[in-house]
Design a protein with these regions (language model features):
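P-loop/Walker A NTP-binding region and its immediately flanking N-terminal helices
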Residues: 1-113
Length: 114
């Protein structure tokens, strides 16, 4: 069972994310928003895991078993930063920090995911 199977989001949205992961040139930015407990938070994490998945077949990325997936899901992947806030706005300092992280090159995976 892949990470995608557990998502509680509309099938159309899940399929779009999977297509983007399987693409050799995924969209450069996605922004996931939602209230606490919303399924979109989990979708963002699964999407990040799939982008950093070590499966060679793009159609199988998001396996949930490789080191890349496991590390993203437990929050310890070097190329994954999970940014969340309950505030309506983020501070200038937080925005600057995110921009700095986004400029870093990936260290382990193919992408830097924030």
């Amino acid at each position: 069972m892949s990470l995608w199977d557990s998502l509680l989001i509309p099938e159309r949205e899940r399929d779009q994310l999977r297509r983007d992961v399987a693409s050799s040139r995924p969209t450069h930015a996605w922004l996931f928003t939602g209230t606490a407990g919303a399924p979109h938070r989990e979708a963002a994490k699964v999407f990040a895991a799939a982008l950093l998945c070590e499966q060679p077949d793009p159609q199988n990325r998001g396996c949930g078993e490789c080191k890349g997936c496991v590390n993203v899901m437990n929050g310890s992947h070097a190329d994954f930063t999970h940014f969340r806030t309950e505030a309506t706005n983020i501070s200038i300092e937080e925005a600057r920090e995110l921009v700095m992280k986004a400029q870093d090159r990936p260290t382990v995976g193919r992408w830097r995911v924030i």
